[in-house]
Structure formats: structure tokens, C-alpha cells
Regions:
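Residues lining hydrophobic/aromatic ligand-binding pockets adjacent to catalytic sites
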Residues: 2-142
């Protein structure tokens, strides 16, 4: 398979920082989509894609209980995801930037555990991708 064919068939997943070690063991390329990644995250083989981070103003209103999940989602869709015409454009941008030969895919990371609402759920729905499931356990946001 050519590199271009590998790039276009890249697996994309979502996950959270607490499971980073497992994702790396399973040969996934970690990409932070948080506004601020953890200080320990800054290694040479870890990436950030701040274009998918929520805007601080509506993130803070959600965390402070001023915005409900629905209001946060509306702002995230309008102010962040609206930059892409369609999900395939965003998928291709992520693949072009981060996919490497011999990896098992790209995993988009944030802080929240699977049981808590997070913008990565909105991203996952927009891209029609899955929370990563591993042989060491299932990490599913449902």
C-alpha cells in the first residue's frame, strides 16, 4: 500500500490523557485537542491541534455552571467546527498533519473521562469516529 493510500485510510479515534501510555503502546499518534495540554505531555512524539480546542469564554461558562451542555455544544459547533465545510475536510487535515507510516492511527485527546461530557464527544460525532477501544479495556464515552 502506498503512503498516500495509507494516509487516506487512517484510523481516527478519541480518548483522554489518563490513558496516554496505553495509546502509545498500541501505536497510536496522540494529538491534544485541549485548550492547554498537561505539562507532562510535551514530548517529541506528541502533538497538539488547537484548532479543535473550545474557546475559553464558553468553556469557562460551562465549567462555572452558567452554560448547560446544549449551550456549550451550540457554541462549539458555531465557533469551532464551523471552520470546516464538512467532516471529511477536517479528517483529511488531521491525517495530513499527523499520520505516520506504521502507526495504527491518530487519537484525539482531552482531559475528561469517558463518563463526563467533553468537546471530544462533539468532535467524535461530527467526524463519525469512535472512542478508542483497546484489548486492555474499553474506553467508551457512552
Amino acid at each position: 500500500m502506498s503512503i498516500e493510500a495509507q494516509k487516506s485510510s487512517c484510523n481516527l479515534y478519541t480518548g483522554y490523557f489518563a490513558k496516554l501510555k496505553i495509546y502509545k503502546q498500541e501505536n497510536l499518534i496522540p494529538v491534544s485537542i485541549a485548550g492547554v495540554a498537561p505539562s507532562w505531555y510535551t514530548h517529541s512524539n506528541e502533538f497538539e491541534f488547537k484548532k479543535l480546542a473550545p474557546k475559553f469564554w464558553f468553556y469557562k461558562k460551562y465549567k462555572d455552571g452558567i452554560f448547560a451542555k446544549e449551550e456549550y455544544t451550540k457554541h462549539y459547533l458555531n465557533e469551532v467546527l464551523s471552520k470546516w465545510e464538512n467532516p471529511n475536510t477536517l479528517k483529511q487535515e488531521l491525517i495530513d498533519l499527523f499520520q505516520k507510516e506504521n502507526s495504527n492511527g491518530i487519537i484525539l485527546l482531552c482531559y475528561e473521562s469517558p463518563n463526563n461530557f467533553c468537546h471530544r464527544q462533539i468532535v467524535r460525532e461530527f467526524l463519525q469516529i469512535n472512542e478508542y477501544r483497546t484489548s486492555k479495556g474499553t474506553y467508551n464515552d457512552k
